Swiss-Prot record:
The gene coding this protein: rlmH
Name of the protein in its database record: Ribosomal RNA large subunit methyltransferase H
Enzymatic reactions: pseudouridine(1915) in 23S rRNA + S-adenosyl-L-methionine = N(3)-methylpseudouridine(1915) in 23S rRNA + S-adenosyl-L-homocysteine + H(+)
Amino acids binding S-adenosyl-L-methionine: 72, 103, 122-127
PANTHER family: METHYLTRANSFERASE (PTHR33603), RIBOSOMAL RNA LARGE SUBUNIT METHYLTRANSFERASE H (PTHR33603:SF1)
Family: Belongs to the RNA methyltransferase RlmH family.
Length: 155
């Protein structure tokens, strides 16, 4: 199974890349993790936030293809680590690849949220883009450690 983290944004600082790499390299071989960066649309020439979101949504959906689509959104469902592990177990059993989407500065377009198979909230807080990437990478690793009975996660 492939986990694809699709992230709208610019090149991240070294600490973000280093932390994400640390968690993704710990993943088992059968869990391939790929980070796909989508260039953010510029708010030039009178483009409003919705037009920017819509253009980004099209590129995100192209990158996701037919994957199970998870959109990270502050209004999404909050879950515990064990609930996330159950979700991930279901993804693995389905045989589909999974794309997890982090929106740009203006967030995700409503059309993408409606197409998502699951809206997931890491937190109700607004967080820096890089921090979300790191938290997402860590939570995916933690969920897999629960599935594989690895001692990384403790209840």
């Amino acid at each position: 199974m492939k986990l694809r983290i699709i992230s709208v944004g610019h090149k991240m600082p070294d600490w973000v890349q280093s932390a994400c790499t640390e968690y993704t390299k710990r993943m088992p071989r059968e869990m391939n993790v790929e980070i796909v960066e989508i260039k953010p649309d510029k708010r030039a020439s009178g483009k409003n936030a919705e037009a920017v979101q819509e253009a980004e949504a099209k590129r995100i959906l192209e990158a996701a293809g037919r994957d199970y689509l998870v959109a990270l959104d502050e209004h999404g469902q909050e879950v515990t680590t064990l609930q996330l592990a159950d979700k991930m177990r279901g993804w693995m059993e389905s045989g589909r690849d999974v794309s997890l989407v982090i929106g740009g500065a203006d967030g995700l377009h409503d059309s993408l949220k409606h197409k998502a198979d699951w809206l997931w909230s890491l937190s109700k807080l607004t967080m820096p883009h890089g921090m979300v990437r790191v938290m997402l990478s860590e939570q995916l690793y933690r969920g897999l450690s629960v599935i594989n009975n690895h001692p990384y996660h403790r209840e």
